[in-house]
Structures are given as C-alpha cells and as structure tokens.
C-alpha cells in the first residue's frame, strides 16, 4: 500500500529533483521548495553545461572513486545504480550517451534537458521557486514542518537537499547545513574540493593557458607520496588546474597545503637513464644548436622558452658547452620539476564541497537522521564526495532517490 505522507523537499537541484520524483512515485504528496529562480541551477554548469550526469561503471568501481565515506553509499547505489539512473533518465524522455571515461551525457548535450525531464515527471506536485526556507520545525524529536517567510508549512517529512557551499553563485550557500546544525547534527569541516591550486613560483603564471598532456603529477606530504597520477594539467594566472590537479585537490582536500610538495614528471614514459640517453642523443645530432632550440623537441615551445632558467643553464649554450652537471640539472628538472602550493582556490571555484553532515548521524539504509525523526538528507550536504566524471552527480541522484522513497514510506513502516 502506497504512502500518503506530505514530504517537503528543500532544494531543487539534482538531489532534490530525484528525491521529489521518487517520493512522488512512492505515493507521497510532494512540495519542493527552491530559493533560486529556477530548478537545477547548478546542473546547468556541470560538464561545461552538458551535464555529466553519471559514470557508466559498476558499483564497486564507482566506490573506488569516492574519496570520503564510500561505504555509506552502498544502500543508495543499490537503490539507484549508475545503470538504473541511465535507464531512468532515458525513460523520462532524455536520451543519454556514453563518452570517453564512461562519462554519461544527454544526447542533446544540454543540461537543461535533464532537469526538464525530472520536472516533467513531477507534474501535479507542488514545485515552487523563489521559495526561501528559514528552518525546520521539530516537536518531540519529530519533524512537523518547515518555516517560510510568512508561515509554517506543516508536513510529515523533510528532505534537506540544499547542496554544500561550492559555487555559491548557484545558490549553494550552506542553508541546509545551518538547519542541520540547529537540529543538533554535526557538520564536519568544510573544504573546497575538485578545485585549482595556487602556486608560489612565478613560472607557471608565465605559461598561463598552456595545457600539458601525458605528464605525471606527484604530491608528497611529509615525504610520503599521497598522489601520483598521469594525465593532463593546465597552467593558469594563479597556478595550476586541469583534471590531474582537480583529482589531487580531492585526495588532499583535508591536508595542510604547506606540508605538500608537488613535482612534475614531464617525461613519465622514460626512466631517468633513458631520458639522459635521449638528451645526449639530441645533443649529438645537433651539436651547433643552442639549448633553447633543442628543447622544443622535448617540450611545448612555450615551456621550452623558460625551461633553461628553471635549470639555471644558459639558453644560448651549445651541447659541447653544457657541462655534465648542467645536463644532470636539465634531465632532473624534466623528471622532477618542483612546485610549491600556497593553497587551494576558494569555494567559488570548487566543483564540490568536502565535508558536510556527519554520516555517523544518518542511517545509510534510509538516509533519515538518527537525531530527528522524519528528517532526511541527500546530495552534497552529506560528508561524501568523489572525483570528477559524473560520480558526484550520481551521488546526488542516488541519495535523493533513496531519501525520497524513504521519506514517503517511513511512517507507514513504523506503524506496520
């Protein structure tokens, strides 16, 4: 027998839309309250506006890409797996496709089609924009409603799906986290994750806009390697960004950046000895060329221009003039070019928030609060975050779906 609970969902992003749909399908009367002027505002900027809505991998692979509290997500991913989400979105009238790295996008390449598909599935329910919630009303340890500007809206269950504090321009200003604290929940330290890094040295800024491919980025904390991956990186006006850097920022989101030592291996396919032999060969094949004219065979031209200074070698020297010590510095810098991190960029540029409502205080099988009956959490509000590639949106959709279904049914199950 289906429930007839009145479920209020605070937040109309990916988690809120999913919660509303699954609560509705479980028989609940749904009111979704979004303080922005439209639903799914953050969805519109995900995947560069194309909405990388999930990753077409199995659950075990998925969990390996979750950085904090992956096991907490087992129930949510069993309820709505990546395969289930693709099927759901297709059934809602938004065909999907799988691209490089198993990233799933709408065929149209328009994020708006994803949010529209969910909204079309919610016809007949109360969906309100420009609706700011001031707090959650609780009596005797049980949710009784939400406080609006002008009144109390009574309900049987509340799902907080207001997001974290990343990209605050999209409305993610931490409202739900404040409500959670007011209700006695622990909110772990919040840090920006999947975010560019600021570098002390000046030379990365000289290379602003240059993208390096097939390089290896290594990070050590107190001389212990914590991250070592190959891929792509981008130099910016403040430091570094790109896929490798965003992943690194996720792995070390809780670290003190002053303890982190970064290094670039510009030729990871070659060992130190192989690279030294390659440099010697290049020198031997062009004995009259200056160093600055030899380096473009090894590096992008813009980087080749500044590289001699990084090695403290005169760029006009010919191979015969380069000492063994200087050649060693050149090879050493190609294999291990150090950078000093001064910090991560702020929440304004972070893809996701590291930290949130402590999962120790939330029941993973239902996503209901262990402190307040009828209070549920979904999405980025929870202390769970993952790498790029559709993983964080999947977390939002899956936790939203489970919370929505649980909120619709929880009183019925208690009375059974």
What is each stretch, according to the model?
Residues 6-32, 403-408:
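N-terminal Rossmann-like FAD-binding beta1-loop-alpha1 element of flavoenzymes
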Residues 8-10, 33, 133, 153-168, ...:
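Short hydrophobic core segments
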Residues 24-48:
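Glycine-rich FAD pyrophosphate-binding loop
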Residues 37-39, 44-45, 59-60, 186-191, ...:
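An anion/pyrophosphate-binding glycine-rich loop and adjacent beta-alpha core
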Residues 50-98:
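Glycine-rich active-site loop/strand segments that organize a redox cofactor
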Residues 78-157:
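Feature captures the FAD/FMN-dependent oxidoreductase FAD-binding
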Residues 129, 135, 305-385:
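A glycine-rich dinucleotide-binding beta-alpha-beta segment and adjacent secondary-structure elements
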Residues 157-203:
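Glycine-rich loop(s) and the adjacent beta-strand/alpha-helix scaffold that form part
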């Amino acid at each position: 027998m289906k429930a007839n609970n009145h479920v209020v969902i605070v937040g109309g992003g990916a988690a809120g839309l999913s919660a509303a749909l699954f609560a509705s399908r479980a028989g609940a009367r749904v009111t979704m309250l979004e303080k922005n002027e439209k639903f799914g505002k953050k969805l519109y900027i995900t995947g560069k506006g194309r909405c990388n809505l999930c990753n077409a991998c199995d659950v075990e692979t998925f969990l390996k890409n979750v950085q904090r509290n992956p096991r907490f997500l087992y129930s949510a991913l069993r309820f709505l797996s990546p395969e289930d989400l693709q099927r759901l979105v297709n059934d809602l009238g938004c065909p999907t496709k799988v691209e490089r790295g198993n990233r799933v996008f709408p065929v149209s390449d328009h994020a708006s089609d994803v949010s529209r598909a969910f909204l079309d599935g919610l016809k007949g329910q109360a969906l309100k924009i420009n609706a700011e919630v001031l707090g959650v009303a609780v009596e005797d340890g049980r949710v009784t409603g939400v406080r609006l500007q002008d009144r109390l809206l009574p309900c049987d269950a509340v799902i907080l799906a207001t997001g974290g504090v990343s990209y605050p321009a999209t409305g993610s200003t931490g409202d739900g986290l404040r409500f959670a604290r007011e209700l006695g929940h622990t909110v772990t330290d919040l840090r920006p994750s999947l975010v560019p890094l600021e570098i002390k040295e000046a030379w990365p800024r000289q290379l602003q806009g240059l993208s390096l491919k097939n390089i290896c980025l290594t990070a050590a904390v107190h001389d212990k390697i914590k991250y070592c991956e190959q891929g792509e990186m981008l130099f910016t006006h403040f430091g570094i960004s790109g896929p490798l850097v965003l992943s690194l920022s996720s792995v070390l989101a809780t670290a003190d950046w002053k303890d982190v030592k970064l290094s670039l291996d510009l030729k990871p396919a070659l060992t130190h000895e192989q690279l030294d032999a390659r440099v010697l060969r290049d020198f031997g094949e062009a004995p009259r060329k200056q160093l600055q004219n030899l380096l473009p065979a090894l590096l992008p031209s813009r980087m080749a221009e500044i590289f001699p200074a990084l090695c403290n070698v005169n760029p006009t020297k010919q191979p015969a003039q380069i000492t063994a010590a200087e050649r060693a510095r050149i090879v050493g810098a190609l294999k291990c070019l150090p950078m000093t991190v001064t910090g991560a960029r702020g929440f304004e540029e972070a893809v996701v928030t590291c930290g949130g409502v402590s999962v120790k205080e939330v029941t993973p099988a239902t996503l209901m609060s262990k402190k307040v009956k009828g209070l549920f959490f979904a999405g980025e509000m929870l202390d769970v975050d993952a790498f790029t590639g559709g993983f964080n949106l999947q977390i939002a959709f899956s936790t939203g779906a489970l919370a929505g279904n649980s909120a619709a049914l929880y009183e019925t199950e208690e009375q059974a």
